[in-house]
């Protein structure tokens, strides 16, 4: 449940099912009710007493940490980080799990390689009290413990907060509430195996209502965790309370992987249509709901919705475990045999850890994280991704730069089209200094950039989408309304007519070469 480390050490409910095994997926005294906000210095405030059962646990943990059961002043404690929530942060999918959390009576699947143990945030002790399958009711004050040997997660926080000086509380929860992401994913996988067709049309119409239903539950959970920390003697500014959003495990471009082994060997066992809906509809809507909940509750928000773009199941550098069936645990197989499927693997948790480290050090209240140039090194950006992408409207034609039919395979066409609000017309220009600097990313995928094919800089050359790689043929300069290849400054992006392909032409100062 916890890991001790040197002070300066650097360092989803199951989301899928196997059709022949699974028809569905998984599910002491409360510490306190939420108390009023306070700005008083934590050192000047005493904690409220815990109920006897929790105090006994606290005293035993203090003895293991310090050699005696006393509750110490904050400035005399070890520093700590703690994560709460569900399978997305517990370590489900990593494959290595702490004793007692890998069945048969407890399937929390906490991994020693989960993100909270791998950040570069200076801390003496790291705690992972999250549990695969958790919903907000398993986290909130007065909630329900998932297993007989588990505490409600807010009670675990109450104990840790009295024994260590908590620097960051990380919450990742919501997927197992109204959204029911696991059962939906199960259905999509089963439908693919049994040739029933895509599941997207079944869920698309009601998806936003599901998101709307989970938002107040996440908000209330954040408020409860604030109350737990106040009752433990902390002022709100003494630590960071971070709500982390969920990345998507699937994308429709997996066949661009030169080593694509096939859907069953690779584990991306859903229809192509469903991978597109997951990336372009389901995950973005979920992210917007999580962002709203975090902002309404006053938590720091980390938007990871694009973090796994280019690293989804069946890609050539995946950060997610695909469909996986453990035929040995349990035996005979059951729903628990596939619970590791479609969850972040060890590389995914390392990416989480990198983003969390950058966020902690940044001081930002809201930030987004992604891998902008397929380097495997996530980069943090201020603000939410929802605000970063903008249309490129041509001053001459009045149309917008459009990814044709929202298809993002390598070589996909980029044209003009009547302006709308679709993600196929959103673009983000990377103004940073990293490997992806000066690239133009499609809102559909952070791993698809505007590209001059083969670096052929000539008048009339049509542009397309390609894997983002940070090469010169994906770098552009914005100058006086024009967009020019960084390596060919006399050529400008041009829309000759409303629906013409986006081409390079000699810069001539015309409105057809200006974008607003």
Q: What kind of feature is each model-predicted range?
A:
Residues 60-132, 189-190:
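Serine-esterase "nucleophile elbow" of acetyl-processing enzymes
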Residues 158-328:
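Alpha-helical cap/lid subdomain in secreted, periplasmic
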Residues 326-374:
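Histidine-centered active-site loop/cap adjacent to the catalytic His
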Residues 1-39:
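Secretory targeting and sorting signals
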Residues 142-164:
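Short, well-structured alpha-helical segments in soluble
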Residues 80-92, 126-130, 167-172, 177-179, ...:
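Structural recognition of the beta-strand scaffold that forms the well-ordered cores
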Residues 379-409, 426-457, 473-499, 516:
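Extracellular glycan-recognition/adhesion modules and their associated mucin-like linkers
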Residues 31-79:
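Low-complexity, acidic Ser/Thr/Pro-rich repeat tracts that form intrinsically disordered stalk/linker regions
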């Amino acid at each position: 449940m916890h890991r001790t480390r040197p002070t300066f050490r650097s360092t989803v409910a199951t989301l899928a099912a196997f059709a022949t095994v699974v028809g569905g997926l998984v599910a002491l005294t409360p510490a306190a009710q939420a108390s009023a906000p306070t700005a008083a210095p934590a050192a000047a405030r005493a904690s409220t007493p815990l109920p006897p059962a929790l105090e006994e646990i606290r005293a035993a943990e203090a003895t293991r940490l310090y050699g005696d059961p006393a509750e110490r002043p904050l400035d005399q404690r070890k520093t700590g980080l703690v994560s709460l929530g569900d399978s997305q942060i517990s370590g489900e999918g990593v494959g290595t799990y702490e004793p007692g959390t890998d069945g048969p009576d407890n399937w929390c699947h906490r991994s020693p390689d989960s993100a909270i143990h791998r950040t570069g945030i200076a801390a003496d002790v790291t705690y992972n009290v999250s549990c695969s399958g958790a919903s907000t009711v398993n986290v909130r004050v007065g909630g329900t413990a998932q297993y007989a040997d588990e505490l409600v997660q807010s009670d675990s926080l109450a104990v840790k907060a009295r024994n260590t000086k908590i620097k960051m509380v990380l919450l990742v929860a919501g997927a197992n509430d109204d959204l029911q992401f696991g059962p939906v994913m199960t259905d999509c996988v089963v439908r693919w195996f049994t040739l029933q067709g895509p599941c997207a049309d079944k869920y698309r119409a009601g998806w936003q209502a599901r998101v709307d239903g989970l938002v107040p539950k996440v908000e209330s959970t954040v408020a409860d965790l604030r109350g737990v920390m106040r009752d433990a003697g902390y002022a709100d500014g003494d630590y960071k309370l971070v709500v982390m959003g969920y990345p998507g495990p699937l994308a429709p471009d997996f066949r661009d992987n030169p080593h694509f082994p096939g859907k069953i060997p690779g584990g991306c066992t859903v229809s192509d249509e469903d991978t597109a809906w997951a990336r372009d509809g389901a995950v973005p809507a979920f992210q917007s709901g999580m962002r709203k909940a975090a902002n309404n509750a006053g938590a720091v928000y980390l938007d990871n919705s694009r973090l796994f773009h280019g690293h989804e199941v069946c890609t050539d550098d995946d950060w997610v475990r695909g469909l996986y069936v453990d035929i040995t645990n349990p035996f005979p197989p059951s729903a628990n045999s596939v619970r590791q499927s479609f969850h972040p693997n060890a590389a995914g948790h390392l990416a989480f850890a990198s983003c969390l480290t950058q966020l902690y050090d940044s001081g930002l209240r809201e930030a987004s994280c992604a891998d902008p140039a397929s380097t495997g090194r996530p980069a943090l950006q201020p603000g939410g991704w929802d605000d970063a992408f903008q249309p490129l409207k041509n001053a001459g034609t009045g149309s917008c730069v459009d990814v044709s039919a929202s298809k993002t395979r390598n070589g996909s066409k980029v044209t003009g089209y009547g302006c709308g609000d679709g993600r196929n017309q959103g673009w983000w220009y990377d103004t940073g200094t990293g490997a992806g600097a000066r690239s133009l990313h499609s809102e559909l995928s952070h791993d698809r950039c505007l590209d001059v094919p083969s670096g052929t800089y000539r008048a009339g050359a049509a542009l397309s989408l390609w894997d983002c790689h940070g090469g010169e043929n994906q770098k552009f300069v914005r100058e006086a309304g024009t967009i020019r290849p960084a390596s060919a400054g006399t050529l400008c992006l041009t829309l000759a007519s409303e629906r013409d392909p986006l081409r390079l032409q000699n810069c001539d100062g015309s409105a057809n070469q200006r974008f607003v």
